[in-house]
């Protein structure tokens, strides 16, 4: 009896060991191999490795996750028109006109039309990026399911279609990466008219991107009747920027409390808002100040803070006792 129990325990140990699972996988692979001739089996394994390599390098889950994060960031960015003069012809003695000077020469009405074009182009570009990323997600899911299919025969029979899918997904990825960077704006008409004998160089319009302005949620702190706010931009601009801070009291209880709101222009990344009510909730919103070249700003960061309670009132006098100070 003891020998039989020991033997059963040993058999159980073998079944529970990793080696038994490896044997099971080998058995399953051997069963699949019996479905194909040796040459076909080698072809199947080679093509399966090609597909696995594509899914682990060119279209890995980690890569798609990074692209999703970049896509979410682009949805929070601000988009502007950037005016750049083209190079003058060789030998021209006139200097290049600086962008600030170019604004004085551009027809304002035509420029407003180009801003609308820039807005539409930016919206379309973001929609296309989302669609391309969705194609990459669905394409990877379909190929991953094909890789895990138990029967190798449909895999071999449809390899031509698989190759086409790999090529198509590579093109989609290239288009996605190329579209991540805002490009030229197509100008149908001249924005700068000829003025007398002055030679004005042709200009080109580009869409540029600025990273979103976001509150520093660790450094922004509420006190009893004031708050200290901090915000930042992930990529620091070359020149100082102007910001617009908005605040308002949530759920005002009286008409007077409805005045607890405001818009404050700020030339730094920090600001203290005073004269607030204690133990109340306020909403704060930060964005860049309005710019003549802004074409699209779909998002702005907001933060909700609650001021701390005021000091407790003194105890009420006992019945029959005069108030304090009398």
From Swiss-Prot:
InterPro entries: DUF5581_C, DUF5581_N, FN3_dom, FN3_sf, FNDC11. It comes from the Eukaryota. Pfam families: DUF5581 (PF17744), DUF5581_N (PF20996). Residues 212-310 form the Fibronectin type-III domain. CDD domains: FN3. Residues 304-326 are annotated as: Disordered. This is Fibronectin type III domain-containing protein 11. It comes from Mus musculus (Mouse). The lineage of its organism: Eukaryota, Metazoa, Chordata, Craniata, Vertebrata.
